[in-house]
Amino acid sequence: MNRGALIKLVESRYVRTDLPEFRPGDTVRVSYKVKEGNRTRIQDFEGIVIRIRRNGFNTTFTVRKVSYGVGVERIFPLHSPLIQKIDIVQRGRARRAKLYFIRNLSDREIRRKLRADRKRIDQDRAAERAAKEEAQKAQEPKASQE
């Protein structure tokens, strides 16, 4: 077994598959574990994904938000065990893979550039509806057996 295959084998044990797919332009809420002193709490960071750097297990994504008039960017490792969950607040339609240009835009201009992606939003809603119906069907036989 060569070195690259061994590294992939070890990394595959730690790859997270429970996180949703998202793209640059999407607005996400990342729940991240933060350790302060001797206690741990979960901190939410909500903003626009401006970059995804895909590098296997070392994949990172950058989220940007404006807080009290100051732009804040945070880089998260995608497969980090400190990420509790990622919620997709809104799907955005971006025409570029790296959205560095939004650093120089106002909120209004950003909204104009990153329109909501209705097609992907509708697909997400349909998938959620199907999952709910599937769960209801799974519950019905249990009720009839009792």
Curated annotation (Swiss-Prot):
InterPro entries in the record: Ribosomal_bL19, Ribosomal_bL19_CS, Ribosomal_bL19_sf, Translation_prot_SH3-like_sf
GO process annotations (BP): translation
Ranges of compositional bias, category Basic and acidic residues: 119-146
Keywords per UniProt: Ribonucleoprotein, Ribosomal protein, RNA-binding, rRNA-binding
CC annotations in GO: cytosolic large ribosomal subunit
Region (Disordered): 116-146
Pfam family, one: Ribosomal_L19
GO molecular function annotations of the record: rRNA binding; structural constituent of ribosome
Lineage: superkingdom: Bacteria
Family: Belongs to the bacterial ribosomal protein bL19 family.
Stated role: Contacts the 16S rRNA of the 30S subunit (part of bridge B6), connecting the 2 subunits.
Subunit structure: Part of the 50S risobomal subunit. Contacts protein L14. Forms a bridge to the 30S subunit in the 70S ribosome, contacting the 16S rRNA.
UniProt cross-references to NCBIfam families, sorted A to Z: rplS_bact (TIGR01024)
PANTHER family: LARGE RIBOSOMAL SUBUNIT PROTEIN BL19M, RIBOSOMAL PROTEIN L19
Protein name per its UniProtKB record: Large ribosomal subunit protein bL19
Organism: Thermus thermophilus (strain ATCC 27634 / DSM 579 / HB8)
Gene transcribed to yield this protein: rplS
